[in-house]
């Protein structure tokens, strides 16, 4: 009887992903009116995400399912909550765009693809088998290729094709690494590989396979020098889709790398892996900082900023994955997600141009201080937070990430990261100068007038809650870090 009940519960857990997808497809076919169809699908998708979060919350802390192919820990549950929360906010922003008739409108096919990518990413985080990891990553990647392809824009088509080509190369490298490990060990399960790797720490085929898998994941993440395609993809995909791709890719890739490190990499020649990773991190920090300093388009600046933040997030892998580094990195990731969410809410729901378009170029921020001082102050606070200026919370989270490397003896890495952070701050301060000081001259052509709204139903709540976190969360820093530490200790 107990076994029957467990099987029934497992069927419910597995079907919670598939049944909503079938329902969404049926709704997209059966409802004829476009606006009504998209609205119903959005509401169904929001409800589905809430149900999935509830199911994840009532699951056991640590358990294995599907005969060891998937595993769930408290850290994985935290990352899944972050993924579902970000996805819910993205769907909400798309809903606001559909309601107001903005350029952020999305089709029913796009919503189904977003949900399909969420399924793939959830499975990727829980994957405890290399072939399961590969297939789940491909599910989300195929959806990303189509979502990034904006057929109404030349840059969107170009970026989508680049994403597809680079994604294919990354997939090939990833699959080659899996084949190399399977040829050497005869298994794809993490538990089996763990025993074999501990007995054969110097097997070059295992080391090469792990290196290829990590390289494929880094290529998908856009770490320098494999970053050029990422900028064009984000510019063509649009602001909201850039937000979705930026956050979700970081969450999934970081969780997959953590799983790989704890189950495989830590028992191999970790020194070689660490040295190679440090070189990539240093190159990424330099390229991301220099690239962001010369950007005039807001979305390209966000893309370069995302590259820098990716380097800071994978720093914990170069620090032997100590508990302190993991806790601080997760805290930094949460701060980054909240800061970027507030920035996107400002751009999409609070700041817009009078022609009902969204802000795309930096110069369009001119006169904001004159038009609406309150909106300008909020925008400046968010920019200062993302720049990591004291006393903002993001400054503390950066300090928490970098200082442990002083103890580990990697002073050069810490000092270079601090130096490059100052370079990024200079650009953020230039944005503040544009908002407060610069004024639109009468002879400038093509400068649309900025309109600032303060409707609480259009992103206002997200902005208020986000700004409160940016300013006041440091008052409860010890409590927040202790909660994260408990979660990390349970993996």
Curated annotation (Swiss-Prot):
Location within or outside the cell: Mitochondrion inner membrane
Cited function: Core subunit of the mitochondrial membrane respiratory chain NADH dehydrogenase (Complex I) that is believed to belong to the minimal assembly required for catalysis. Complex I functions in the transfer of electrons from NADH to the respiratory chain. The immediate electron acceptor for the enzyme is believed to be ubiquinone.
EC number of the protein: 7.1.1.2
Primary gene name: nad2
Catalytic activity: a ubiquinone + NADH + 5 H(+)(in) = a ubiquinol + NAD(+) + 4 H(+)(out)
Keyword Electron transport listed: yes
Lineage: Eukaryota, Amoebozoa, Evosea, Eumycetozoa, Dictyostelia
Gene Ontology cellular component terms for the protein in this record: mitochondrial inner membrane
GO molecular function: NADH dehydrogenase (ubiquinone) activity
Residue spans crossing the bilayer: 11-31, 38-58, 74-94, 106-126, 129-149, 161-181, 210-230, 238-258, 270-290, 298-318, 330-350, 375-395, 411-433, 463-483
Keyword Ligase: no
Database matches in InterPro entries: ND/Mrp_TM
Domain of life: Eukaryota
Family of this protein: Belongs to the complex I subunit 2 family.
Top EC group: translocase
Protein name as annotated: NADH-ubiquinone oxidoreductase chain 2
Major subcellular location class: mitochondrion
Pfam family, one: Proton_antipo_M
Membrane topology, from the record: Multi-pass membrane protein
Keywords linked to the UniProt accession: Electron transport, Membrane, Mitochondrion, Mitochondrion inner membrane, NAD, Respiratory chain, Translocase, Transmembrane, Transmembrane helix, Transport, Ubiquinone
